[in-house]
Curated annotation (Swiss-Prot):
HAMAP family hit by this protein: GTPase_MnmE
Protein name per UniProt: tRNA modification GTPase MnmE
Membership in a protein family: Belongs to the TRAFAC class TrmE-Era-EngA-EngB-Septin-like GTPase superfamily. TrmE GTPase family.
Positions of Mg(2+) binding: 238, 259
EC number: 3.6.-.-
Cofactor comment text: Binds 1 potassium ion per subunit.
Record keywords: Cytoplasm, GTP-binding, Hydrolase, Magnesium, Metal-binding, Nucleotide-binding, Potassium, tRNA processing
Amino acid sequence: MTFARSSRSGLQDTIAAVATAPGSAGVGIVRVSGPRALEIADGLFRGKRRPSATPGGRFLFGELHADEELLDEGLCLVFRGPRSYTGEDVAEVQTHGSPAVLSRVLARTLDLGARLARPGEFTLRAYLAGRLDLTQAEAVLGLVEASTETARRQSALGLSGALSERVAGVARALTRTLAAIQALLDYPEEGVPDEDRAAPLLGAQSALEELLASAHAGRISTRGARLALIGRPNAGKSSLLNALLGYERSIVTPLPGTTRDYLEAGLELAGVPVTLVDTAGLRETEDLIEAAGVRQAVALAGNADLVLVLEDGSQPREPLPTELPPTATVLRLRTKADLPAAWTDPAALDVSAVTGAGLPALREAIGAALLGDATRGEAWLTTERQTDTVRRALTHVQAARTLPDDLAGYELEEALHALAELTGQDVQEDVVDAVFRNFCVGK
């Protein structure tokens, strides 16, 4: 493997950092990792046994001292390499979680010879020690940042190695096919049978296409989605926004044109972090301010992941006065379903912001529209880096299916290189730094 110089530097140092979030809490953790971790813990911790004399996987209760000054009481957890998170000797000190206590405990570890860890350096060391591959390291960050159950579940799958295993299955098929091609090219006089490569390459292509199709759901589940509420004045946009939120966020009146500027509100829908955008009603108007709001609404629809087009089901149906961007993904709603229907449309969902009728079905429809056909029980691609490597691998496999053996072999080598980059087995010098740059100190 190839690593960036900045990733390799200082790997023999013993590092320390606060591993819990800033602010006051019941418990705080200071993590120390490296060749002198247990020696440094000896200088900080006083109990019935020294950390350096304690087997791995044990914890001690005692006092934390800076020379003769008592800092706090707490626990010291001992992990011995290579059976630790980083693959090195690790001491984790658990104290009361006040900033003052954690600051003094961390300062004491630095006085005893530790260096302040860089962002993500503990997980970087786990990766370099072979405890994690690069997709699992990215999943660690995903778990730290997960704000919804879907994001948590996907990150947990990634950390378990589920994504790596999906990739490994494709890589094994490509490796076998490449070996057969190389045998044909290297020993034609031996009469090596021409193994049919069409079926395994088609299978690999299908697997990569399925994996690539999960990228949209992976991005949505981690970064969130924007939903624009679009419709004529008094179609019920603001009422629906309030109903989905469960509280009054947007002003609702019977007067057309009440909403002139857009309004945003966040919530979780179908396990996805969603930003709802309430927009101005679409109509032709001489009012300059309202006209600006209409133009803005159309622009917001073009930038949304999903557009909810609301039409008043209690009034004669009218087409929108403005066409939506052709790239918009649209979900049509027939609103005010609690009132007598002036029209019906099986392609539109019936909803009522007053009674709540249709809202559960709407939430399910939003989830289906955002997550598509991605199988919830399988690991998805969740980062742009992962998506790019799979896209490159797919391009090379598609090319290999149409080329003669010598050129097909080259394409398969490139596909395998892309998959190895995905898991971090063969990675460019700047990729590792780019991944770990997003981590916080202490992880």
